Amino acid sequence: MSSSTSTIVAIASAAGTGGVGIVRLSGPQSRQIAVQLGVARLQPRHAHYARFRDAQGAVIDDGIALWFNAPHSFTGEDVVELQGHGSPVLLRQLVARCIELGARQARAGEFSERAFLNGKLDLAQAEAIADVIAAGDLRAARAARRALDGVFSRRVDAVAHTLTRLRIHVEAAIDFADEPLDTLGGNQVRDGLTQARTLLAQLLRDAERGRTLRDGLHAVLIGPPNAGKSSLLNALAGSERAIVTDVAGTTRDTLHEAIQLDGFELTLVDTAGLRDGGDAIEREGMRRARAELERADLALVVLDARDPQAARAAIGDAIDAVPRQLWIHNKCDLLSDAAPLDVNAIAVSAVTGQGLEQLHIRLRELALGDGVEGVDGEFSARTRHVEALRRAERHVDAADLELGFEQLELAAEELRLAHEALGEITGKISADDLLGKIFSSFCIGK
């Protein structure tokens, strides 16, 4: 049966035992199944006490039944929620009875998928449901809540609306090719392109911040041996996670440690020191360090403050591929008062704690930009959103270039591709396989 004609059922409450458990039904048979379970009367948006019974009339459980009639429900279909005791055994028995009465087990994310397909929320909002549930702290939860409320989607739609107006002018210029572009609203096209680029740049910046709030930041500690990378990881983590000795090359493998820092998760990766030579085990450690850099959002380049230039030479070009870098001069407590400090680096001492507060501030700035906790526009975002915005930005830039050469057909195509990239975010333009991947990552009852 298709999703539009079948009735689905699943446990909607959290896994495990609890005070209350919820079984959710959605589809045309929801109300009928509830009646057959033993709910004598159902009024929309009213709570009704009932005993839920099996095929022989024995009581499975007792609790509350609520009916949300279409289209005034989460999915846009008839929805019934059966609230009973939070026993996994009883909840599974209740689901099995619903299936006997004509429902089928819901797929992962199918309730949210139906809400999307029925126009109750767009794709970015549907994804935000999972982000609200998975939020690791209050700031991430608030950002996810704003995305669910449509803050992100409305900004995407604003850019899309600007592109629509642009496309109208460019398509008109193509239809009237004998007329100069300026007589067909050339200034409006140029102004519109400027506005679109500005809106996209701002939205991309905020989406990258939202992705950091959702996914955290992957930061790799890199540098020569005995620069104090492991000591710095321990200082940032607030515990002795890495082995620290005075022997160069102590760290041979990678060590991952996740910490909470000002509203986002920072995953620190301690790595083997980079240098020429070393035994086979140390060389393997250095290979793994370089591999970690390829996946890094941020490189924390740790150098010995007493001789940073020599330490910098040992690293070579290993960090060139990492877009964001923070240079740290460790062991600053061992410097004489007259020793000069690099103004582009942060001086710290993992032993005394000197400079760690400044390091925290700089890490936050690199992760979240100049965003302030609690600003109205902060929202959660995902990697696919950021990638789609980057594609849209590239296509708008290309359209601007083509218009400069008066290549109107090519400019129109670039604007169409930019529009399409934005549509992928909200689901206005999405391939079926993309939708399947997104909703299959949800909980069964969501």
Swiss-Prot record:
UniProt KW keywords: Cytoplasm, GTP-binding, Hydrolase, Magnesium, Metal-binding, Nucleotide-binding, Potassium, tRNA processing
**GO BP, one annotated term:** tRNA wobble uridine modification
Assembly and partners? Homodimer. Heterotetramer of two MnmE and two MnmG subunits.
Q: Where in the cell is it found?
A: Cytoplasm
Organism from which the protein derives: Xanthomonas oryzae pv. oryzae (strain MAFF 311018)
- Name under which the protein is recorded: tRNA modification GTPase MnmE
Record domain TrmE-type G: where? 216-368
**In the UniProt record, what gene is named as encoding this protein?**
mnmE
Q: Name one GO molecular function term.
A: GTPase activity
